[in-house]
Amino acid sequence: MISSVVQSRDSKRENSLWLRKGQLMDYLERTGRVFDVQRYSIHDGPGIRTIVFLKGCVLRCRWCCNPESQEYKIQTMKVLGEDKVIGRDVTVREMIEEVECDRPYYYRSGGGMTLSGGECLCQPEFARDLLRAAKERGINTAIESMACAPWENIEMILPYLDLYLMDIKHTDPIKHKEFTGKSNELMMENARKVALSKMTKLVIRVPVIPTFNDTVEEIQNIARFAATLPGVEKIHLLPYHRLGQDKYEGLGRKYLMEGIEPPSPEHMITLKKAVHAVCGLDCQIGG
């Protein structure tokens, strides 16, 4: 009995270590790259949350409101005429200590930590270990992601994930590639795999973008797909906005959605009704 207890304890310790340059390292010392931390958020998951924004993304969505997230490298962006460094390297330990500062708010509101980006799965080991650190401290976990990653990168985070907020932007692979730079087959396949795993709660989110996917037919096609995913009960429609437009100028880039107006509240209600017309999912505007 004593031997089995010791073996179990040793096994847990081995699982908390990883190899770096020939040395075993505690997983809390793993380093990742973030570009922002937003505290007291009431979006992107239940309750009051801390959103950790990770650097790097494989898509180049025309409407992206965080263009400074796309490159993994640390950048300089003009903000109000001043140079601002975008990106910093942190360990899991440093980041979780920052997240834990707001534990009382999580406790009272049912909130927690959400990983966003960019695409947090571009740093899969760091994302996994940060989620693990939160779970081991009793903090609710969520990610905001479009699942454009190898399945093994997604599978490794699921044991530590309470909520997956997954973007599905379009069902047409050609139009998806035209507006984001990549086709959608991998993302839709991964959505099915996450749903079938039953390891986390899955919510489908749709950025509603004029000229891209804002017709009744396009939204209904996404809703029909979402309704085929086992366990999925909710779909969020997120109206396009231009809050990140100035960032493109600060990065010396052209904003490709110039002149495109956000969808009206009336049109968003029409799309919500269109979802309800074809499936039984709970549909909400915003999220």
Positions of PLM-derived features:
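Short alpha-helix boundary/capping motifs
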Residues: 76, 80, 162-163, 204, ...
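Auxiliary Fe-S-binding modules of radical SAM enzymes
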Residues: 1-43, 210-287
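Short glycine-enriched, charge-decorated loop/helix-capping segments at active-site entrances
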Residues: 81-85, 177-183, 252-260
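A general alpha-helical scaffold signature found inside nucleotide-binding enzyme cores
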Residues: 90, 182-189, 266, 270
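Conserved AdoMet/S-adenosylmethionine-binding subsite of the radical SAM
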Residues: 96-250
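Short alpha-helical interface patches
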Residues: 81-84, 93-100, 265-276
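N-terminal [4Fe-4S]-dependent radical SAM core
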Residues: 1-91, 101-109
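Glycine-centered flexibility sites
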Residues: 45-47, 56, 63-64, 87, ...
